[in-house]
């Protein structure tokens, strides 16, 4: 029950984050602000995550029920606050800040829920479900924004999202009261100090910096990049294809690689495919070809998120799972900010923009090569 409610809430955080991304032109006219100001409604989320990720993770490890409930309440309250003035930029911005404050408490819970409520052999699947929920929320935001806006304006769009979010928030607040089925070792100190010298966690963080950074940069700049080749109009569909492929990959790959103990090999494949994918797009600009490339890219790249989170929970243990997830997602969000800005600086030349994405992935190849080849030898294999 709690995983279903959590999955819905996690999806809603992405839905609220990206509310205005597919309707930027219409929204800036309705609110009477610039398109850049509308973009800031999504841009505040990764910045807030960088600030709040670590303290949120520590609170979740220390007081899980209270912390996740607070995240659910903030998410629901932010969704409702936007309804105070759907066409008022001030009200909408205030609501986005509230949602952004709750998002780290929700997303950092993904491995903690798996560790508290599922036996070891089912935790990989639970983490995969949570990750699939995130990507489903992204896809729902991209596909539903324009139809709801056309049907009833900003009020209908924000009302529909708020209603769904409140249902999810109430569901989580109620279900999180269920006592944990599996308890960690109370002797393990809940702190953040262990992260400083943990080489393995820093390698995983570097990979998420690259992976989430590449995805955010593609979602932000693909239309502009393809516009140089006369294919800008296809960008929305191509991003949807990449995200849908990521949902499929996140649903099937993590369990397979965990069962075969091939986590490093999968992560190496993900970054290697990324290097090749954007070089291929730079070489051939056919929309159908780009769609095929981004399908493969999304399938492996987005599936890397649950693989990394699953591996981090094995390494950190149930007692520190939320802090580990917070650290990794902080790195991912920071990567989103940095790579978006790097590509922005090169956006006048599409070949340089695509080359920057491949270069970032090449750094990921070097990081992945330094991970342990297998986890069983390090006592990190899931129980059968």
Predicted feature locations:
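A late C-terminal transmembrane helix in Major Facilitator Superfamily
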Residues: 313-349, 357
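Extracytoplasmic gate region of multi-pass secondary transporters
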Residues: 20-21, 200-250
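C-terminal transmembrane helical hairpin of 12-TM major facilitator-type secondary transporters
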Residues: 263-308
